[in-house]
């Protein structure tokens, strides 16, 4: 299955809540969820049936996939990896998703959305520990130093991000030096440090069927 290419605003409306897929627009009056708080399509404003238990679990999985921009096969692989680890499977899953390079770039404030972060990583704008890193799904490790490529730092895009990053506070497991355009992974995130509004237990129940 290819990557979803339709309007990201439609994805938020389908879930009935903001997934913050479009950066600053999600915080503005232009947000589609604020203006049209009903699902997309001809029957979007019609009466909605009460979802089944399976339907609720499926929606939660789809929502999480959309938030992190991950395809089904890759998401299932993350779940299997999380299930093999010690600890709580749902927590392990979210930690793996948070460790993705595109997510870390977003969390550091070097991109306005995960989608933009993925594009910037793909285009080779970032280094990890001095080596070029252009794979969005790469999992960062404790101690990794992420930096904007030297030749990219003077671009208008990154100068703007530099100014914005100076006013943003990264999660506790990351540190950022906005002036030098670098960030460091201090630790792996704990569940309480992840502000993504998902119920991961529903995903565990879905895949455990």
UniProtKB/Swiss-Prot annotation:
Keywords: Ribonucleoprotein, Ribosomal protein, RNA-binding, rRNA-binding. The keyword Nucleotidyltransferase does not apply. Coiled coil: none annotated. GO terms for cellular component: small ribosomal subunit. Part of the 30S ribosomal subunit. Contacts protein S5. The interaction surface between S4 and S5 is involved in control of translational fidelity. SMART domains: Ribosomal_S4 (SM01390), S4 (SM00363). One of its GO terms (biological process) is translation. It comes from the Bacteria. It holds the Pfam family Ribosomal_S4. Belongs to the universal ribosomal protein uS4 family. GO terms for molecular function: rRNA binding; structural constituent of ribosome. It comes from Syntrophomonas wolfei subsp. wolfei (strain DSM 2245B / Goettingen). Residues 99-162 form the S4 RNA-binding domain. PROSITE patterns: RIBOSOMAL_S4 (PS00632), S4 (PS50889). This is Small ribosomal subunit protein uS4. InterPro entries: Ribosomal_uS4, Ribosomal_uS4_bac-type, Ribosomal_uS4_CS, Ribosomal_uS4_N, S4_RNA-bd, S4_RNA-bd_sf. One of the primary rRNA binding proteins, it binds directly to 16S rRNA where it nucleates assembly of the body of the 30S subunit. With S5 and S12 plays an important role in translational accuracy. The keyword RNA-binding applies.
